[in-house]
Each structure stands twice: as structure tokens, then as C-alpha cells.
């Protein structure tokens, strides 16, 4: 799949990022991950991101990363394109990017580098180095320490033909509008704020109709139904989903830092697809919080 074909796929439909399965000892659980992918693939997501943020990329060892990407690519070979999360220091990000390409990933989600503060020029050089190390398409994730400006994104687009997507995790509307207007159809644009459904209608109005769904991991039918309501501008249905599910969900998610990942794993367990515990420094939901989530999920009906 060439970068432009990937760009076309990412320009419509719902995207998601499966959680990564761990066993009770916290090690990668391949069989559980395969079962998860086989369950989710038929629901109709346009693409899945393996080892992304919700997949706990930040806690994976290099050897685990290879096994996770290979498992995802092999399992979904005939059903849905797999993009691989990459990130961290530049040389590490390049190694992961090249490994994901070797294993058959159709594209990459370039997550922010960690901890080190850097100038805009330095971040742009980091993105360019990763893009030029591979031939497959790359989506850059503006979030936390990665805050690329429209001017730098325009320069990167000129220098890196395989940079085909921009994912926004900042929620800076002025910046998002500026990037969308400046870059036009050069990129596919993805909404990437945590629990992106809450912002989906607003982002669609800005020209960003595509987003990645975390709740697809445990209420996939609801996630797809909500996406279709957004796509057809059914404001009444969208409002009902937000009132009945997403706002109560946020009340649980916002109880502790890091719960944006933990609550997804809790939901998967309640749905019958236990992915095991999160890895430190994240913490799992408490039993009471799991009960609250289970009650909320039960109200949504069979998935």
C-alpha cells in the first residue's frame, strides 16, 4: 500500500487502536491479542493502530513491540489495515519504524518524543528523520511536547512525500483551523483527543470528520453507531449518545490521571475480552469504578 492509498483510507470512516493484551504477570499475551483483533475487525473500522497510546506503546520492550506488530499484521492481513505506533528518541523511533515496515504495517503513527523539551525546528527534524527512514505513510501526532506549527508542517509536507496525515491531540482550535486551511488536501486529518467522540461534531465542522475511538475496544457497535450519527449530522442522536454514555463515562475516566487507558482495559474485561492489567506507572480502575462502568455498559445493550 503506497502512502497516497493509505491517506485515502484514513480520510473517511472510524479508526481505533486496540489495547495490548497482557497476562497476569504483565507479559504480552499473544492469543488474547489475536482474539481481540478477530473480534474487532469485522465491525468496520477503516484502520487499526497497533501499539498506539492506548496500546501502551510507552511501556513496551523492543522485543515485545516486534511481536505485537507482527501479530496484528498477520491477524488482520485480509480484513483491515494496520498502522504501527512509533515514538521516543529519534533513533529509537527510526528503529521501530523500520521494524514495523519490515513486518508489513501499512503505515505509522508517530507519537510524541518523551520528556525532552525541544524547539520547533528540532521537533521538525525528528519527524523528518523518521519519515525519510521508511517508504510507508506516516501520520504525525501533535500532542504534549509535539506542537508543530502550520509553517513547519507545510515545510515537512514538501520534504517528506510519505508524511500523509496529521492527528490532533492538543485541542487548540485556532491551531487546528490554521493547519487545516494552510495544508488543505495535502494531509488526511484525524481527531485524536482522549474520548474523541465528545469533540467529533466540532471537529467535523472544522473539516476533520475522522477520529480514533477508544471505546471501540469494548462497545464497538455503539462506537460505530455514534460515528454514523456524526457522519449524517444527526444531532439529536449524537446528543443522546453523549448524554447517556459519554458524559457518564468521562466522570469515571477523569477520576485519576492515566485512566484514559485504564478505563478502556476495564471496559474490555467487562465485555468479555480481558486484556489483563495496565503496566506501571498506570493504575487499574478500582472495583467500585469497574462496577460503575459495567452498569453504564449494560445500559447500552448487546454489542
Swiss-Prot record:
GO terms for molecular function: 4-hydroxy-tetrahydrodipicolinate synthase activity; 5-dehydro-4-deoxyglucarate dehydratase activity. Pathway: Carbohydrate acid metabolism; D-glucarate degradation; 2,5-dioxopentanoate from D-glucarate: step 2/2. CDD domains: KDGDH. GO terms for biological process: D-glucarate catabolic process. The keyword Lyase applies. SUPFAM superfamilies: Aldolase. The keyword Lyase applies. It is an enzyme of class 4 (lyase). Pfam families: DHDPS. Its EC number is 4.2.1.41. Belongs to the DapA family. HAMAP family: KDGDH (MF_00694). This is Probable 5-dehydro-4-deoxyglucarate dehydratase. It comes from Pseudomonas savastanoi pv. phaseolicola (strain 1448A / Race 6). The lineage of its organism: Bacteria, Pseudomonadati, Pseudomonadota, Gammaproteobacteria, Pseudomonadales.
Amino acid at each position: 500500500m503506497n502512502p497516497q492509498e493509505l491517506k485515502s483510507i484514513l480520510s473517511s470512516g472510524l479508526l481505533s487502536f486496540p489495547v495490548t493484551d497482557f497476562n497476569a504477570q504483565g507479559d504480552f499475551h499473544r492469543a488474547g491479542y489475536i482474539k481481540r483483533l478477530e473480534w474487532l475487525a469485522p465491525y468496520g473500522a477503516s484502520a487499526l493502530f497497533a501499539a498506539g497510546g492506548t496500546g501502551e506503546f510507552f511501556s513496551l520492550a523492543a522485543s515485545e513491540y516486534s511481536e505485537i506488530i507482527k501479530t496484528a499484521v498477520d491477524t488482520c492481513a485480509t480484513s483491515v489495515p494496520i498502522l504501527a505506533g512509533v515514538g521516543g528518541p529519534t533513533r529509537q523511533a527510526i528503529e521501530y519504524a523500520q521494524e514495523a515496515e519490515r513486518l508489513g504495517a501499512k503505515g505509522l503513527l508517530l507519537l510524541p518524543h518523551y520528556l525532552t523539551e525541544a524547539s520547533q525546528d528540532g521537533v521538525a527534524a525528528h519527524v523528518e528523520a523518521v519519515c525519510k527512514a521508511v517508504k510507508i505513510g506516516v501520520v504525525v501526532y501533535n500532542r504534549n511536547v509535539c506542537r508543530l506549527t502550520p509553517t513547519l508542517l507545510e515545510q515537512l509536507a514538501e520534504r517528506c512525500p510519505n508524511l500523509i496525515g496529521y492527528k490532533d491531540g492538543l485541542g487548540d482550535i485556532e491551531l487546528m483551523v490554521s493547519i487545516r486551511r494552510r495544508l488543505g488536501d495535502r494531509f488526511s486529518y484525524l481527531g485524536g483527543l482522549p474520548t474523541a467522540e465528545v469533540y467529533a461534531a466540532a471537529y467535523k465542522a472544522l473539516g476533520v470528520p475522522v477520529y480514533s475511538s477508544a471505546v471501540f475496544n469494548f462497545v464497538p457497535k455503539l462506537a460505530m453507531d455514534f460515528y454514523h450519527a456524526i457522519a449524517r449530522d444527526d444531532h439529536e442522536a449524537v446528543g443522546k449518545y453523549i448524554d447517556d454514555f459519554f458524559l457518564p463515562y468521562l466522570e469515571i475516566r477523569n477520576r485519576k490521571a492515566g485512566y484514559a487507558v485504564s478505563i478502556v482495559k476495564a471496559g474490555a474485561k467487562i465485555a468479555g475480552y480481558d486484556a489483563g492489567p495496565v503496566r506501571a506507572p498506570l493504575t487499574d480502575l478500582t472495583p467500585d469504578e469497574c462496577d460503575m462502568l459495567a452498569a453504564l455498559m449494560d445500559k447500552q445493550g448487546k454489542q
